[in-house]
Amino acid sequence: MAVDYPTIIANAMTNQSATFDQVPRSLMNPTPGEQAMYNRDAVADLQWAGNDIEGAKALLDEAGVVDSDGDGWREFNGQKLSYVATCPNGWSDWQAAIEVVAAAGKKIGIDITTNYPEWGVYQTVVTKSDAPLPEGYDIFMMWSDGAGPTQPWGRIRKLLSSEFVGMASNWNGNWGQYSNPEADALIQALPTTTDPDELKAAYTKLVEIYLTEVPSFTLMY
């Protein structure tokens, strides 16, 4: 909510990506075909566009995540919120995006520092889904599927399905090891669902889950 997505799109993507004002965030790519596969009105209240510093602060305040000692950083259960955001070294577009994420944290009282390991180290850590991610990988970037004949189902599966949790070598997705039985059931049912209304309802529910629980979030199209 607090991230300056227009800056990411302008700098990291050299304006070669739709903005979230133009195409509100969901689980779909920005093409008309995929955008028609869910009910945008049903999730409109969840589709933040970014740069909403005051809105993000208000949510944190409401949740009781406040700066109780006046040092400028918020705490939760007595612990200062301090995270490391990371992506591979030398991936300049990703690094530019990660710096914007870190800057957003500071604006709302969350300490986010950046670190850029070499790709060989990074990919070994992130794709190991049979153990919790180690220190230094609190926030990290990876890719998701683009257009293709199995989309948007394939992309959603790789973002949300718990089937990848526990894999010693996971190049598929869900690298944050998210698990939601309702999402799993919807994903498993989609390939055999043929009724257009049922498909749209299922995709809409998956978008709602994704935007409500935020197991990950998109920085750019």
Name every feature range the model reports, one short phrase each.
Residues 99-108, 121-137:
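Short helices/loops that flank or line small-molecule/ion binding pockets
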Residues 76-79, 131-135, 181, 210-212:
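Extracellular/periplasmic catalytic domains that process cell-envelope and extracellular macromolecules
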Residues 117, 137-156:
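Ligand-binding clamshell of periplasmic/extracellular solute-binding protein-like
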Residues 1, 9-10, 19-21, 49, ...:
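Extracytoplasmic/peripheral linker and loop segments enriched in polar/acidic and small residues
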Residues 36-46, 127-133, 166-170:
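Surface-exposed intrinsically disordered loops and tails
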Residues 1-103, 174-179, 198, 205:
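Append "and occasionally in soluble cytosolic enzymes with long acidic Gly/Pro-rich linkers
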Residues 12, 87-89, 116-118, 141-145, ...:
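Active-site proximal loops enriched in glycine and acidic residues that flank catalytic Cys/His/Asp
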Residues 5-8, 80-82, 107-111, 134-139, ...:
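Loop/turn elements at helix/coil->beta-strand transitions in domains of secreted/extracellular proteins
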